[in-house]
């Protein structure tokens, strides 16, 4: 598979590195307005290929995106310490207006994978600018939040996060919804499993985990300015599912009508991801509080997206 990455900063380059380590792409082309940066990142990653999967990686131009099956959009201005993701909207929407036509001029059949924040609204903007079907314009969404949730649950219970099945829904941001009622360890509800292992999840533990998931990005940004390793790994995971037509269930952002009372909104619910992009969504069986929270998240995103005129 050939993958293009527009934006060779830390997120884009970490995604490229993670794909090389996973061996999910045969070709990766990095594009950045700072050509010197793109060349440096490509060379640095290339020098690691002898220790990983053989991958052709280089810095190029939009013309080099020809035949790319996936193009990752990681270009945009970064999130400042303490800045809400939604505040990034107007600045990054302008960036996409310039980038996407250039991408599609050379890769009209590609799947666009958006990671620029605020990712849910930016995914919707990318869909509107591109005119592509919604299954071919997907965002990283709450994939990273879901990984954080699983990691913290696994740590608390004392099992591998790979054995934890839990999802974060809605916005990748402040209104996200931790789907506690649907969380399992193996095939056992997380609360029941935690009790069996004498590691109960009481109100205090639940609040601690909830807060840690929600505030993780802000704490990382406060310490080093941005997040990149986790999201880079998540992007590689999405590309892997597309490359292998895996039909993996991943919490990605795409256009959906699963929220009652809101015909269509771009947010995260678990979706089947394969060669065609975003497949059918899993309609979550939520408790009353979770339903209200997801509805509120959808309303926030809908209002933000509708406020942007393309």
Residue positions per predicted region:
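Aromatic pocket-lining residues of Rossmann-like dinucleotide-binding sites
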Residues: 19
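C-terminal substrate-binding/catalytic lobe of Rossmann-fold NAD(P)-dependent dehydrogenases
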Residues: 130-136, 146-310
